C-alpha cells in the first residue's frame, strides 16, 4: 500500500476529550431554580426538539445568539448570554498523548483537523489548547456547511487540502465517518486508542 501523504484528524474524541453529558450538567447549573428539575427529566425529549437548531449551528447556518434563542424558547426561560456561552463551551478536557503523536507525524505529513463543530467550540479549543495549533489547517463543518459523513463535507475538505483522496488518511472515532470517508475514496481508520492507532498506521506513514 502506498504511503499516506496527508493526515486528516478528527478533533473531539481523538485529539481532545469532550463530554456531551458535561454539557447537560452545565446547563442544569444555569437554569432558573424552578426549571432545573424539569430540564433534567425532559433532557432526552429536549435533545430531539433542539436537533434542528443544533444541526444548523454545526453547519454554520445559525448564529450563537440564534441558538440561545431556540433554547430559551423551548425551555421558556431567559438565559444570561455569558453563562450560556460558558456552559456551552466548558465540555473539553486537555489534549493527551494522541495529540502529541499527531504533532510528531505532522513534521513529515501535512495534517488537518476535520471536525463537526461550531465557531464557538473551535475558538474555545484553540484558546484552551494552543498545543493543537501545529495543524496545517482546520476544516470545521460550520465553514463548509456540511457534516461528516456527508459526501459534501469530504469533497470540500479534499478541495481545501489539494490532494487526491487516495493519498489522504482520516482518523476518526465515529465509524460512520470512517465509512463515509472511504466511500469518497479517502483512506480511513476507526480510532480506538493510541496503541491501536500506532499498530494500524504501521507501514502507512
Task: Describe the role of every protein-language-model region.
Residues 107-108, 204:
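Structured helix-beta-strand junction loops
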Residues 110-112, 187:
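Proline-centered loop/turn at the N-terminus of a beta-strand
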Residues 10-13, 60, 105, 113, ...:
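Generic structural signal for small/hydrophobic residues in well-ordered secondary structure
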Residues 2-99, 107, 118-121:
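N-terminal helical cap/lid subdomain that shapes the substrate entry/recognition surface
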Residues 1-9, 118-119, 123-205:
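Asp-based, Mg2+/Mn2+-dependent phosphohydrolase catalytic module
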Amino acid at each position: 500500500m502506498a504511503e499516506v501523504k496527508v493526515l486528516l484528524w478528527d478533533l473531539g474524541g481523538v485529539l481532545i476529550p469532550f463530554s456531551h453529558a458535561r454539557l447537560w450538567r452545565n446547563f442544569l447549573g444555569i437554569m432558573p431554580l424552578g426549571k432545573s428539575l424539569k430540564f433534567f427529566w425532559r433532557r432526552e425529549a429536549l435533545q430531539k426538539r433542539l436537533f434542528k437548531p443544533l444541526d444548523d449551528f454545526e453547519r454554520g447556518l445559525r448564529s450563537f445568539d440564534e441558538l440561545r434563542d431556540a433554547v430559551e424558547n423551548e425551555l421558556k426561560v431567559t438565559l444570561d448570554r455569558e453563562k450560556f456561552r460558558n456552559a456551552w463551551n466548558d465540555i473539553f478536557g486537555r489534549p493527551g498523548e494522541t495529540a502529541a503523536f499527531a504533532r510528531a507525524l505532522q513534521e513529515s505529513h501535512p495534517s488537518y483537523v476535520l471536525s463537526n463543530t461550531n465557531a464557538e467550540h473551535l475558538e474555545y479549543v484553540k484558546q484552551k489548547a494552543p498545543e493543537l495549533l501545529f495543524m496545517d489547517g482546520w476544516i470545521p463543518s460550520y465553514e463548509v456547511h456540511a457534516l461528516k459523513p456527508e459526501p459534501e463535507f469530504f469533497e470540500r475538505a479534499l478541495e481545501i487540502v489539494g490532494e487526491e483522496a487516495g493519498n489522504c488518511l482520516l482518523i476518526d472515532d465515529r465509524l460512520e465517518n470512517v465509512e463515509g470517508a472511504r466511500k469518497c475514496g479517502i483512506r480511513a481508520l476507526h480510532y480506538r486508542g493510541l496503541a491501536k492507532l500506532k499498530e494500524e498506521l504501521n507501514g502507512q506513514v
